[in-house]
Design a protein with these regions (language model features):
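N-terminal targeting leaders
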Residues: 1-88, 92-93, 97, 127-129
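C-terminal catalytic lobe of FAD-dependent flavoproteins
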Residues: 2-4, 22-27, 31, 36, ...
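Hydrophobic anchor at the start of a short beta-strand
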Residues: 53, 96, 104-106, 194-195, ...
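Active-site substrate-recognition segment that forms the wall
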Residues: 84, 94-102, 111, 129, ...
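Glycine-rich FAD pyrophosphate-binding loop
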Residues: 101-122
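Dinucleotide-binding Rossmann-like beta1-alpha1 core, especially the glycine-rich loop
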Residues: 125-206, 346-347
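Short beta-strand to alpha-helix junction loop
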Residues: 134, 139-144, 172-179, 218-237, ...
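Helical element adjacent to the flavin cofactor pocket in flavoenzyme catalytic cores
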Residues: 218-276, 280, 284
Length: 514
């Protein structure tokens, strides 16, 4: 670690910031009045040879209280689970399911009133192929493994999952000539399967309304779509069916660490005494790691907005596609001047598993970990940019939009590991995009480490299959009629837009997750 070089780079941005080696990490301290400069300092501190960037620069005048449940009781006081999982997003629920394979008492706590209330419900549901990643990244390892797991996982959990593919479309002749062999070489090096070149005529066969400028593109057959929140809920329900426990409205506000172990976790529902802790806390994962004395990273929230179009516009995309970013955006498609734009795959136009067209997302570095606000400026910029990929896009097609915050680290990689300074914590942190893809594979590694460290035995009665009522609107009339004959409440439609029946709502309320 060349600390002098890092100090020069950081102080060029902000001379008042202190740079030091803190337990093998690059630690930044001080106070600035501009969030963009804080972000830039963190990026400048990234280097090989350090465990990570611990960016403790304060934003002058800014303080954010985490959203906490109002509930306070002693329901969990004195409990001694073998494993405590902090966070009920897709990673936490996938970990709970994997650990329910073992003869262990597993407890998951989530501060919201349901699972999948953070980034796990505020994303597009893409199962990514991994072509945008780099050799040596944890992201690449877990995305490749997780992508391959989804076919069987969806079958076991009764999830809708389609490999509708992704396309990366070229708008210029030079891209169409130069990029394909390089793209194919990268796919081979990374181990991404199902990548091939498609010409202009094949693009027209794949997409009913392709952009007129399309010269050719790269087709990635392994990409797919799921419902991210339905996947999270199914993972959680299956974990509960196999013996795991879930406590919602439960907020972790401190830990006691003795020697090199967490011995007590303080919550609004009492003190818990676990043998092991798994940190799956999303945008708060660095806060949890800090409580446990194991922090080597910093989460800098990266906000993104997605737009949902009316289902009648399904002809806009039958797969997921975007304009190649190698050629610069035309002036008319460039976003209006705004705050620092963060690292992003660039967004695109895609068909969701529920049949709507989704457009976006964008990316902005923000200080707030739970900033879910939307703005007309962001909506306008997304439409302006993505009209290049799909010229038929129109603001009048929008039915709603939403924002979420990604749990990005300055290294732009996951932090999936055993504890370094605290031996009974397991980190599953920095899980931003493509976290939905990676979650099942991350959970397998966490399970294997805990199985080894706690000397846990496998259950003989673990059931990987979760059976639930299928989405009736997706069934053929004769299949739907069979369900209605058994239970007339399946024929009583409550939501006419999405054709959701009273019976399906009751089934959801009576599912294992309460």
């Amino acid at each position: 670690m060349n600390l002098a070089k890092i100090r020069r780079a950081v102080n060029k941005i902000a001379p008042s910031v202190k740079v030091e080696n803190y337990r093998g990490c690059v630690r930044l301290t001080g106070e600035l009045d501009n969030w963009t400069d804080i972000y830039k300092c963190g990026k400048a501190a990234v280097c090989k040879g350090s465990l990570g960037v611990v960016n403790d620069i304060r934003l002058k005048g800014f303080h954010e209280e985490p959203k906490k449940p109002t509930l306070k009781d002693d329901a969990l006081s004195g409990q001694k689970p073998d494993v405590l999982i902090v966070g009920g997003g897709i990673v936490g629920c996938a970990v709970a399911r994997e650990l329910s394979r073992l003869k262990l008492d597993v407890l998951l706590v989530e501060k919201s009133n349901d699972v999948a209330c953070g980034a796990s419900s505020r994303n597009d549901g893409c199962i990514h192929p991994g072509i945008d990643l780099h050799k040596g990244q944890q992201k690449l390892k877990y995305v490749l493994e997780g992508n391959r797991m989804y076919t069987q996982l969806a079958k076991n959990l009764g999830l809708s999952f389609k490999r509708w593919a992704q396309m990366f479309i070229f708008s210029t002749g030079w891209e169409n000539t130069i990029i394909p062999p390089l793209f194919l070489l990268k796919a081979k090096i990374l181990g991404v399967e199902g990548v091939r070149y498609v010409g202009k005529e094949e693009i027209k066969r794949i997409e009913p309304n392709p952009p007129a400028w399309a010269k050719g593109g790269m087709y990635m057959a392994s990409a797919g779509m799921v419902s991210p929140y339905k996947t999270t809920i199914a993972l959680c329900d299956n974990a509960i069916q196999n013996g795991a426990r879930v406590s919602l409205n439960t907020y972790v506000d401190g830990m006691d660490v003795k020697g090199d172990k967490v011995v007590c976790v303080h919550t609004n529902r009492g003190d818990i005494y676990p043998r092991a802790v798994v940190n799956c806390a999303g945008v708060y994962s660095d806060v949890i790691a800090d409580m446990a004395g194991d922090r080597t990273f910093t989460i800098h929230p990266r906000k993104g907005t997605d737009i949902i179009l009316d289902k009648k516009k399904v002809g806009y995309a039958l797969s997921s596609y975007a304009r190649s970013y190698f050629a610069p955006l035309p002036k008319e498609a460039q976003p209006d001047k705004q705050e620092e734009v963060g690292h992003t795959k660039g967004g695109g136009v895609m068909r969701t598993i529920d049949g709507n067209i989704l457009v976006g997302p964008d990316a902005h570095e923000v200080p707030s970990r739970e900033d879910y606000s939307t703005s007309i400026k962001d909506i306008d910029n997304i439409i302006k940019k993505q009209k290049l990929a799909q010229p038929m896009l129109n603001k009048g097609d929008i039915i709603t939009y939403f924002s979420g915050t990604r749990a990005a680290t300055y290294e732009e990689d996951f932090v999936v590991r055993r504890g370094i300074f605290t031996k009974n914590i397991y980190e599953a942190a920095g899980i931003q995009s493509p976290g939905i893809t990676a979650a099942p594979a991350i959970a397998v590694d966490i399970r294997n480490w805990i199985k080894e460290d706690l000397k846990a035995e496998e259950k003989t009665n673990f059931n990987p299959v979760y059976k639930h009522t299928p989405r009736l609107a997706n069934l053929k009339d004769e299949e739907r009629a069979k369900y209605i004959a058994k239970n007339p409440e399946y024929g009583e439609i409550i939501c006419r837009c999405e054709e959701v029946s009273k019976g399906e709502i009751i089934d959801a309320l009576e599912s294992p997750l309460k």
